[in-house]
């Protein structure tokens, strides 16, 4: 019965296929193999899309949608793009999260019976980009696979991640708890995520294009074996991945998919890195966002820490900088080695100094991505010429590094890495023309002298010019037609052109080839014989050149690992040189590390803000076991958030390996950096501003350790005054008593400044400001002790709030202050007994009136003795006395 059903189904399919033309049958077969992908079907000089693909491409790419004929009774909708411009259209599709299958003609139209043979040679997806035209120079593109592991009860117990930078061949694995997935994806920022049907729901929204793959691709045992085969090892023990489970399953699915899109092996994926959470300083999504490491809060690329630090001379260095900023190592050993290398670069002699080194680095090509294309056999001629020129420049670069490497072990390691693979430079020099064409099909790629057969064929083609000149001279003399011309075009080949008024002089052996409005074009037996010989030589030369070029690519494959080593060394050298340039230009210093708990920053500056203003006020920051929490008060716009962020950024920069913007800095161990700064709601997630604030606070309270650095800015402001005050008080107490972490706690709740009385490990500092006339001057200096007011009305006035509103607010503020003075001190500790307020005795005689100190000071001075400067100083003094009152002056 089953056999009958299968037979009838096949017959029905055959009948349906017969209704289409042979070419459409070929297209539909290819399309059935790529149902969710736009198929770019090569037809001559164009890539055509049909049916639904054509409609979608026309909409996304702004193409003209046409309709030509019908197949099986259905109108054929078409849209096409020129083959030479396909990359720019692919780039647009990738930005929309779409994928495209590139279907090329692989058969010879002259010998094909029926449609020319075609096949899909590659699939371009958001996560598998390698072509330079599709990639951003300064950021990596990651393809990530996600595999959920379950316990015996069927509950998700861990999540395995495998992500690949196909352009470089870097493969990484990690296993983590389910609640850590969002933070990991935020850090990796994959362009495309592979997941099985049952796990797609685990992926947070907006994290990249999601591609469904069969669940069996994630089999753990198969994934482990596939990894071993890819890395050409018997066991993964050497990579620390043998004990992994779900991560190996994810890696298996990743490798299957990546190889399928490229249509070949991934020869450049020869190493593996297993990421461990304890290896790096933890930075959650909120911290990365609030510190503006690589993207501002407005979503722009500048001004950020990355944009400030990125003075790299190569794209490889810029990409490595982005990776280092998001992966600061916890161990200070790596940072110290980088600091040592920066110091050696700064102290180098002029002939091998920083400027000379960076000048040489500017001539270096993107070896990392060229190597990736080499491994995938998709490198273009100018990739190879750039690689050749880079390898030719390496000996001089190595000499410069060697002269200063004795003072830094890291530079010695890099100097050794910059040796080109043996024989690689010689092959590229002999094989590739000095200035090759962009594409092999254009010819002129293989250097003369590399292949005798190619040189002979080229000689035939290149001697055409002289033959045509000689023929033209002879024919003018023979026919008496002085303006006769012998020319060539790609459509009609070689021809003799005669103007219409001279056609009566044409000899009998001239055969008409083309008629124009004002001329006739002819061919002669002699010219036809030469044409056959010349065009045949040209075609054979191009075919020979294509074969030779493919041979060069194959010959370079054994050198892939050596090229990757060179690329890695160049990227790190470039980044260290950029760090040295920043340190010299911006007056940064090398930080120190200690095993003792503490953060000490002398005259620290915010690196990004300092670059945006004319003058920046430097400030100190000291945190240690006796001073774990700083309560920061002061006016709005006074610099509280800047001070907090600069402390975190200086710490981060130190562990990344950069010098830091300070007079001196010293750091103990840091395991994580948390920030709770700013206010923003999450409308898509259904969370209010206050809910977002409390969620971030909860993460800090649950995860911060004594080695964590915590920034808390105005916690509790998203709710009512007393609720917010109570929460802020309780959170600060918990950070001191339970987490015992380094904490910078900015607040406008001045009641919190009483906290140091209960916890000696807390201290008050404030950002100072002075009133000047009807305005306010922010001093941006951090001083010990609490602030005495917030200057909110003055800031509102600076912001342009209308004067009537300011006057009304000032009047209401006076009323509130009078009310507050008449009430008891608020009960801050929710579990303490209410404070006892002593009532004044009514029968006591009133105290004698005390003259106001400002008045006394005025009576003491002689106005005629005051100089202008003294008068200004006195004005400020009187202003302070007037605000303090008699009682304060006496204290």
Curated annotation (Swiss-Prot):
CDD domains: ABC_MutS1. ATP binds at residues 634-641. Keywords: ATP-binding, DNA damage, DNA repair, DNA-binding, Nucleotide-binding. Gene3D superfamilies: 1.10.1420.10, 6.10.140.430, DNA repair protein MutS, domain I, MutS, connector domain, P-loop containing nucleotide triphosphate hydrolases. One of its GO terms (cellular component) is cytosol. It comes from the Bacteria. GO terms for biological process: mismatch repair. GO terms for molecular function: ATP binding; ATP-dependent DNA damage sensor activity; damaged DNA binding; mismatched DNA binding. Pfam families: MutS_I (PF01624), MutS_II (PF05188), MutS_III (PF05192), MutS_IV (PF05190), MutS_V (PF00488). PROSITE patterns: DNA_MISMATCH_REPAIR_2. HAMAP family: MutS. Belongs to the DNA mismatch repair MutS family. This protein is involved in the repair of mismatches in DNA. It is possible that it carries out the mismatch recognition step. This protein has a weak ATPase activity. This is DNA mismatch repair protein MutS. The lineage of its organism: Bacteria, Pseudomonadati, Pseudomonadota, Betaproteobacteria, Burkholderiales. The gene is mutS.
């Amino acid at each position: 019965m089953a056999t009958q059903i299968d037979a009838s189904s096949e017959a029905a399919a055959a009948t349906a296929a017969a209704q289409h033309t042979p070419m459409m049958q070929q297209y539909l077969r290819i399309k059935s193999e790529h149902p969710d992908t736009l198929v770019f079907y090569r037809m001559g000089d164009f890539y055509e899309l049909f049916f639904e693909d054509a409609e979608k491409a026309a909409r996304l790419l702004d193409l003209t949608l046409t309709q030509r004929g019908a197949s099986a009774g259905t109108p054929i909708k078409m849209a096409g793009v020129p083959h030479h411009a396909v990359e720019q259209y692919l780039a647009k599709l990738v930005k929309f999260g779409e994928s495209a299958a590139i279907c090329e003609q692989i058969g010879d139209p002259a010998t094909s019976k029926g449609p020319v043979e075609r096949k899909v040679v590659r699939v371009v997806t958001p996560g598998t980009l390698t072509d330079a035209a599709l990639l951003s120079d300064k950021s990596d593109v990651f393809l990530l696979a996600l595999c959920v592991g379950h316990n015996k009860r069927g509950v998700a117990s861990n999540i395995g991640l495998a992500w690949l930078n196909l352009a470089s061949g870097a493969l990484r694995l990690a296993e983590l708890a389910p609640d850590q997935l969002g933070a990991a994806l935020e850090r990796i920022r994959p362009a495309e995520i592979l997941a099985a049907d049952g796990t797609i729901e685990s992926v947070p929204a907006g994290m990249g294009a999601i591609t469904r793959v069969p669940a069996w691709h994630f089999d753990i045992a198969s994934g482990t074996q596939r990894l071993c085969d890819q890395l050409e090892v018997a066991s993964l023990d050497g990579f620390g991945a043998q004990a992994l489970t779900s991560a190996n399953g994810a890696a298996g699915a990743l490798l299957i998919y990546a190889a399928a899109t490229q249509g070949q092996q991934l020869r450049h994926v020869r190493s593996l890195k297993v990421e461990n959470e304890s290896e790096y300083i933890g930075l959650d999504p909120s911290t990365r966002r609030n510190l503006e490491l690589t993207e501002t809060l407005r979503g722009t690329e500048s001004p950020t820490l990355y944009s400030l630090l990125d003075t790299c001379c190569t794209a490889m260095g810029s990409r490595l900088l982005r990776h280092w900023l998001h992966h600061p190592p916890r161990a200070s050993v790596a940072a110290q080695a980088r600091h040592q290398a920066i110091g050696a670069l700064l102290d180098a002699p002029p002939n091998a100094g920083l400027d000379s080194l960076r000048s040489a680095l500017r001539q270096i090509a993107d070896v990392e991505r060229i190597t990736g294309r080499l491994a995938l056999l998709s490198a273009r001629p100018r990739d190879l010429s750039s690689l050749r020129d880079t390898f030719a420049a390496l000996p001089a670069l190595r000499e410069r590094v060697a002269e200063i490497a004795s003072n830094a072990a890291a530079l010695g390691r890099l100097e050794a890495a910059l040796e080109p693979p043996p024989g690689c430079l010689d092959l590229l020099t002999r094989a590739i023309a000095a200035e090759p064409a962009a594409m092999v099909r254009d010819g002129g790629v293989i250097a003369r002298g590399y292949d005798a057969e190619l040189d002979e064929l080229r000689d035939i083609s290149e001697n055409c010019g002289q033959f045509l000149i000689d023929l033209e001279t002879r024919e003018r003399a023979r026919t008496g037609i002085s303006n006769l011309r012998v020319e060539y075009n790609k459509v009609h080949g070689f021809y003799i052109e005669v103007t219409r008024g001279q056609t009566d002089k044409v000899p009998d052996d001239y055969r008409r080839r083309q008629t124009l409005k004002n001329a006739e074009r002819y061919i002669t037996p002699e010219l036809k014989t030469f044409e056959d010989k010349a065009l045949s030589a040209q075609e054979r030369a191009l075919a020979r050149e294509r074969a030779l070029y493919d041979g060069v690519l194959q010959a370079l494959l054994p050198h892939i690992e050596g090229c990757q080593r060179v690329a890695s060394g160049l990227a790190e050298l470039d980044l260290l040189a950029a760090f040295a340039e920043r340190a010299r230009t911006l007056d940064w210093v090398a930080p120190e590390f200690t095993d003792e708990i503490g953060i000490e920053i002398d005259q620290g500056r915010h690196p990004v803000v300092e670059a945006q203003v004319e003058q920046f006020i430097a400030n100190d920051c000291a945190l240690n076991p006796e001073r774990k929490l700083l309560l920061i008060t002061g006016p709005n716009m006074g610099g509280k958030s800047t001070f907090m962020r600069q402390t975190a950024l200086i710490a981060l920069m130190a562990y990344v390996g950069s010098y830091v913007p300070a007079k001196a800095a010293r750091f103990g161990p840091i395991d994580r950096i948390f920030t709770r700064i700013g206010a923003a709601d999450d409308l898509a997630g259904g969370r209010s501003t206050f809910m977002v604030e409390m969620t971030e606070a909860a993460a800090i309270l649950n995860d911060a350790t004594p080695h964590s650095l915590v920034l808390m800015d105005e916690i509790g402001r998203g709710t009512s005054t007393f609720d917010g005050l109570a929460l802020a008080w309780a959170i600060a107490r918990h950070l001191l008593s339970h987490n015992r972490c380094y904490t910078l706690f900015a607040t406008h709740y001045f009641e919190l400044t009483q906290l140091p009385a209960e916890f000696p490990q807390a201290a008050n500092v404030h950002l100072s400001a002075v009133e000047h006339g009807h305005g306010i001057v922010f001093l941006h200096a951090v001083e010990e002790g609490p602030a005495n007011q917030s200057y909110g009305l003055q800031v509102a006035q600076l912001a342009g709030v209308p004067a009537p509103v300011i006057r009304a607010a000032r009047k209401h503020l006076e009323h509130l202050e009078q009310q507050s003075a008449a009430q008891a001190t608020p009960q801050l500790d929710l579990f303490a007994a209410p404070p006892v307020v002593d009532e004044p005795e009514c029968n006591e005689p009133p105290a004698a009136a005390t003259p106001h100190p400002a008045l006394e000071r005025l009576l003491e001075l002689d106005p005629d003795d005051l100089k202008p400067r003294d008068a200004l100083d006195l004005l400020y003094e009187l202003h302070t006395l007037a605000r303090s009152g008699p009682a304060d002056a006496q204290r």
